[in-house]
């Protein structure tokens, strides 16, 4: 009985330790048109690899900024789409040691 309780306690401590190492990462950036004007309400999606399931998503602000809070570590593709412009796909590898990832300014190209 003592071994069972000790084993269960060890399992609980290990599980809690694993969960405490999962950090929330904030992904942010700015989206502009090729004229350098902000891409207002552009769609920003964070797709989890390998199956491209949407993990998070938002629309850009009036200034073209976006923030995706509470993202967990992993491999992703950041997809940015906006009517009249070509979609952009940016690979992201977010590590557990990271708390924030700024992808910078993304310039969208006009869809001819």
Model-derived segments and spans:
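Structured interaction patches on ligand/partner-binding surfaces of diverse proteins
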Residues: 85-103
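Bacterial Sec-dependent N-terminal signal peptides
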Residues: 1-30, 76
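Glycine-centered loop-to-beta-strand initiation motif
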Residues: 29, 60-68, 106
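Short, acidic Ser/Thr/Gly-rich low-complexity loop/linker segments typical of extracellular
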Residues: 49-65
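A short, solvent-exposed loop/turn motif at the edges and junctions
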Residues: 48-53, 75, 79-91
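Short Pro-Gly-centered beta-turn/loop motif in secreted/extracellular proteins
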Residues: 37-40, 67-75, 83
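Structural motif
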Residues: 28-39
